[in-house]
Amino acid sequence: MLLTAFYVVLGSFAAPCQQDGDHIVTCQVNKCETVGLFEICTECKTGGVPVDGFCRPFGSIQAAAAGCTKADGTALDKTATTCGKCGDGYFLFMGGCYKTESQPGSEICTTASNGLCTACKVDSQYIFQNKATPSEKGSECILCWDTTDRNGVMGVANCATCTAPASSTGPATCTECMAGTYKKSDTECAACHSDCATCSGEANNQCTSCETGKYLKSNQCVEKNTCNTNHYPDDTSMTCVACTVLDANCATCSFDSATAKGKCLTCNSNKIPRTTLDGTSTCVENSYAGCQGADNELFMKEDQSACLLCGDTKEASNDKGVANCRTCTKNANDSPPTCTACLDGYFLERGSCTTTCADNCATCSEATTEDKCKICKAGFFLASPGEGKCISCSDTNNGGIDGCAECTKEPAGPLKCTKCKPNRKPAGTSDNYTCTEKTCEDPTVCGGTSGACDAIVIDANGKEHYYCSYCGETNKFPIDGLCTDNKGTNAGCTDHTCSYCAAGFFLYMGGCYKIDTVPGSYMCSKSTTAGVCDTPNANNRFFVVPKAISAEQSVLACGNPLGTIAGGNAYVGVEGCSQCTAPDARADGGMAVATCTACEDGKKPGKSGTGCVACPDANCKSCTMDDVCEECADGFSLDNGKCVSSGTNKSGLSTGAIAGISVAAIVVVGGLVGFLCWWFICRGKAQ
């Protein structure tokens, strides 16, 4: 998920898991924690343990690799929810095992030994080193806001950043408090006034930002209608802004939602307001020159009461501007403004901008003629130098770049992509992108930044495709993975998502999918009349979730380790798994994992089917960790995690070779004995 130098603490100790996060299914209620930019789980549902912040099945490859065991070193069992001890290369922290070499572990600890952290990452400022010798293993690093007493050492409630206690015991020294609180002392973060989102003190006039719906004015949070007279309510910053911020001579003002800027309405000192096309508002001299300015975008009314935009046609007679005009001149009374340049897409002809250029042209030499464009609108480029037709940046049939949204082209240079379409992933430099595979099958990316495209569907060839899980527009919802306002028979689809589906459909990641239409057919081949999948696709890349009802997701990808909830139980796939069988149903609110039967990327399932590992030895049936075999093929036996021929001893010689050597040795020894007998007996008689 791109880090910055400063990490904002988003959570508090023992916090609820984020609803759209990675742990809502597998983590116990209120057992999530946010460390830097990462949400981690500190206690999993029964049958799972935290490894690098994620809940993994107790018998998984990840748990084995981390050396996760009970505190006494004995093996985990199906009742496990946390790790009590970690192996080499990992350290114990808040019930989980973490690596120092990768995130989120690297944001907690820099050096570890024997399964414990020996040097915490204190420069992050949200964690400190326990100077005492903790009796509870895993308490070597403490979060600033963790108030659990660990041998007399603890954090400070609601503290965001801190340093270790001055002595070996006591609370941390808080340097900054969380939102909604302020630093009352080095060891106390006190609550702000209820009006404030953030504050510098407890009073209602010590706010630094406000709760939703209120505006900050003179350090107090007020209603929008009180931002009046010499202030305007800025809907972007949620503050009451003084008119003098726009210009020292601005007397009254308002907020222009079209430009998201303040607009001066009246000025002092005999000046008049001037607001340009981009929304910049100032007070200028009451003169033709003052209104015209350096950009020539405005002209003065003949009664000298206001500056008007060149394209403003609301006034009458000589004060009427020219429709679609960008710049103009007006030097005296008794004459209307003269347009000198039109807005993009309009052609200036005999002082008028009423005739448009051809489609996609910003400026042109002839109106409506497509090959007379001089400058193209954003998203298009000139087909030939000088002037010509404007071609879409993504039109590959005419020299465009696949997936490109905006581009540039020098007269003698190649076409370069500067921005990819929302559903494409950019690669390369920002002035010459290659727009790689789709990040979302919906061209709108499910409504842009307010939508989500997290529904992963695996096709018949094993390729992942991303479909809509949440639609940004309130009147749309995901049907067959794309946002639409046509729900058909799916009455359970309302604003943004679907909560249940009709017969012939099934619910998957917030959307309804048909069983006989791609992409739904990749996942399910048969569903009940209640809209529940009961038979997965024959490719076994998905499994049916046991005992799911219509309001629950009834199918899950074999490789989805984040899982889904059905009947209060967590059902998860296996990371890297391509084919699997469904787990048995649970009834205790715990975690059940699919049994993996085939893996991606040349890996093999472990013997238990709960993990995929690199297992390159052709004579090994399954590995417990990368390159560590746990079961060999017939004719081979285990020797320190490797498979050796059952007819081979540790010297590397086969039994046949050993037998041959033995026979040869017997012959040699027999010959030697015979020779000695002859020597001592026969030679003795001869003498």
From Swiss-Prot:
<keyword id="KW-0472">Membrane</keyword>
<feature type="signal peptide">
    <location>
        <begin position="1"/>
        <end position="14"/>
    </location>
</feature>
<dbReference type="InterPro" id="IPR000742">
    <property type="entry name" value="EGF-like_dom"/>
</dbReference>
<keyword id="KW-1003">Cell membrane</keyword>
<keyword id="KW-1133">Transmembrane helix</keyword>
<dbReference type="GO" id="GO:0005886">
    <property type="term" value="C:plasma membrane"/>
</dbReference>
<dbReference type="InterPro" id="IPR052798">
    <property type="entry name" value="Giardia_VSA"/>
</dbReference>
<feature type="transmembrane region" description="Helical">
    <location>
        <begin position="661"/>
        <end position="681"/>
    </location>
</feature>
<dbReference type="InterPro" id="IPR006212">
    <property type="entry name" value="Furin_repeat"/>
</dbReference>
<feature type="topological domain" description="Cytoplasmic">
    <location>
        <begin position="682"/>
        <end position="687"/>
    </location>
</feature>
<dbReference type="Pfam" id="PF03302">
    <property type="entry name" value="VSP"/>
</dbReference>
<keyword id="KW-0325">Glycoprotein</keyword>
<dbReference type="InterPro" id="IPR009030">
    <property type="entry name" value="Growth_fac_rcpt_cys_sf"/>
</dbReference>
<keyword id="KW-0812">Transmembrane</keyword>
<feature type="topological domain" description="Extracellular">
    <location>
        <begin position="15"/>
        <end position="660"/>
    </location>
</feature>
<keyword id="KW-0449">Lipoprotein</keyword>
<comment type="similarity">
    <text>Belongs to the Giardia variant surface protein family.</text>
</comment>
<keyword id="KW-0732">Signal</keyword>
<keyword id="KW-0564">Palmitate</keyword>
<protein>
    <recommendedName>
        <fullName>Variant-specific surface protein VSP4A1</fullName>
    </recommendedName>
</protein>
<keyword id="KW-0677">Repeat</keyword>
<dbReference type="InterPro" id="IPR005127">
    <property type="entry name" value="Giardia_VSP"/>
</dbReference>
